[in-house]
Amino acid sequence: MKDGILASGLAAGSRIEHNRVSTSAANGILVKCIDKSVVDGNYSFKNKARGILLQRCESAMVADNFVSENAINGIELNIRSNHSSVQGNVCGSNKKSGLRIAGSKGISADGNSFRGN
């Protein structure tokens, strides 16, 4: 499956910012194994899976993104994306949840907007 943006194993603190991703065959943005990563100010919509997915990303930040009309969840943090922050995102009209947190602890979610998920 093809993700719009796949970032995996890059240096800690890597940033994915100000992109427009749509109609990907899988996730719009997938970030794997990048601690302290930042996903900020992106538009991710109409993807076949999730808008934004983080896996094994400790102390990451997902902020000020617009995610909509994705086939699964708008934003998802799973598999030990511990102590991460999700703030100021707009999640609307995703097929399942606007925000899903699974297998992660110490997540802070503030100032997000959810509608019609």
Residue ranges with predicted function:
Residues 11-12, 21, 34-35, 43, ...:
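Short amphipathic alpha-helical surface micro-motifs
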Residues 13-17, 37-42, 60-63, 83-87, ...:
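All-beta strand scaffolds that present successive hydrophobic residues in beta-strands
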Residues 80, 96, 100-117:
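Short hairpin/turn module used for nucleic-acid contact or packing/dimerization
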Residues 1-9, 25-33, 48-56, 71-78, ...:
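Short glycine/acidic-rich loop motifs that flank beta-strands on beta-rich extracellular proteins
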